[in-house]
Amino acid sequence: MSQIKENPALVAAQEAQRKINEALDAGYSFRLEAGAGAGKTYSLVAALKKLIDERGSMLVRTGKKVACITYTEVARNEIAQEIEDHPAILVDTIHGFCWAFIRQFQKAIRDLVSEIDDKKEKIELGGGIGSQLVEYDLGFFSVDEKRITLNHDDIPELMAMLLAKEKFQMLFSEQFPVIFIDEYQDTNRKFMDAITEFFLKPKTGHIIGLF
């Protein structure tokens, strides 16, 4: 009588999930290495559901969230649907996530924009930086007397620049004790370098999950 062999992909997925659960229980950061079609999204959703079950009420009560940063809108929508848009989880694309955070700090953004070398000519032509409103809606960089508009690539770069400052590291930490990054290998390099340098390497107490 022949034995039924277990599906190797299923066995690997179960083992990966076990390791993720162990890391979450211990409060450790982790990285899931798996190729396309290896069930990374399933593992990410399962990890989010575990956090919702175990910490969801506490996170909502204290005004904190698990950040789940996706590479595409499609992934964002899929994950948000799977967790039923639970209020303890913020699921967004990297640009949506970064803009939601940095837009709170208008003066800091204006100061940082003025430090970016390839912006200086346009800033000068636009009359300089004063107290304009900084916006991200047109998709290109411009400056006039009333507003500064940011382009697509500015958003993660400015987020990385902001996170280099201790004040904003603390504010970020207060809001997001757990950060999951989907398709981290394709995620903006400056943003990933900032997360690694200021939250992963120093062992800040954050749980960083890289999928």
What would you call each of these model-derived segments?
Residues K50, T196-F211:
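Conserved RecA-like helicase ATPase core segment
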Residues I52-G56, L162-K167, F199:
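Structural motif corresponding to the C-terminal cap of alpha-helices
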Residues W99, N188-R189:
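Conserved protein kinase catalytic core
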Residues M1-K107:
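P-loop NTPase Walker
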Residues G96, Q185-D186:
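Short, glycine/acidic-enriched loop or turn micro-motifs at the edges of active sites
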Residues M1-A38, S43, Q106-E183, R189-A194, ...:
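Accessory N-terminal region flanking or inserted into the helicase ATPase core
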Residues K65-Y71, V178-I179, I208-F211:
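Extended hydrophobic secondary-structure segments that form protein cores and membrane-embedded regions
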Residues M58-K64, S173-E174, K203-I207:
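Short helix-terminating capping/connector loops at secondary-structure junctions
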